[in-house]
Amino acid sequence: GSEMCIRDRSYGELIDRPAGSFVPKSEFLLQRNQDSPLLPMSDLFDQIWQGSMPALNSAPEQDWNCYYSSYVQTFLQRDVKELAQVNDELQFYRFLCAAANYTGSMLNYAALAKEVEITPPTAKQWLKVLAAAGLVYFLEPFAHPNLKYAVKAPKLYFTDTGLAAYLLRWSSAATLEAGAMASNFFETWVVNEIYKSFINCGQIPPLSYFRDFNTKEVELLIETDGCVYPLAIRKSAQPVKEIKKFEILKPIAEGEKALRIGSGGVVCLANDLLPVDAKNWYIPVGLL
């Protein structure tokens, strides 16, 4: 097997937090808040920029640039040839960088293809190669017969925020945090941590997102046992209005295929786990 498929480690693994899939039930959140050290906010973007590769996290003296440079080179020279029969390495590298720009965003195959001067079917094929190598995954849109105006495109996430930062040439955690992609990287990191919490328990992550044609979006829906737990994701300390968005999900609780809407919240830069209302919480990102 290829070393490219080494599973990136979640932050929880790095600090030896007990494994458990992340479902934002109130008792789970309160228990974790009690048991677990929070990732300090000042370290958050260091962690996002550093990424989740075990080799980088276990050897601080390892140079970030050199590590990712050789990682990408190995991937292009060995894995891509095996997986994609791509003849033009440079063009595939340009594609990889262009794809990194989409992390945390809805996929637009045509726009991505145009940037790299390939056809949309080729872009689709090459993204499958990245997914097969474990570099990206797709978050599919939530579908329910009562939600008529749902967007159908998946969202793209790079499994390692460090690799995405390298490909987009963010040279430090500080420039990344201050830059135009900060929210996308924050969202990518949050979704990754939750995604990995299921993978690490041997489960297929029951995750999706919902966005309607008015661009109202719930960033993450966790569906388990006939219940949907909604999460908003916001890079601010107390995003008051986010919970209101959950109202667009109300129709799913009615009719033949009714699902319950469980507790949820906003994963944000709050310092403490705090209730927003009877069902929802401000969830500090460090609690993931």
Features from the language model and the residues they span:
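Generic structural marker for isolated residues within well-ordered, non-membrane alpha-helices
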Residues: 11, 109, 191
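Interdomain motor-coupling "hinge/lid" segment immediately C-terminal to the ATP-binding subdomain
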Residues: 2-3, 7-101, 105
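Conserved phosphate/pyrophosphate-binding and hydrolysis machinery centered on Walker-type P-loop NTPases
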Residues: 34, 58-66, 85-89, 102, ...
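A cross-kingdom feature that marks ATP-driven nucleic-acid transaction machinery
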Residues: 128-129, 134-136, 140-288
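A short alpha-helical element within helix-turn-helix/winged-helix DNA-binding domains
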Residues: 106, 111-116
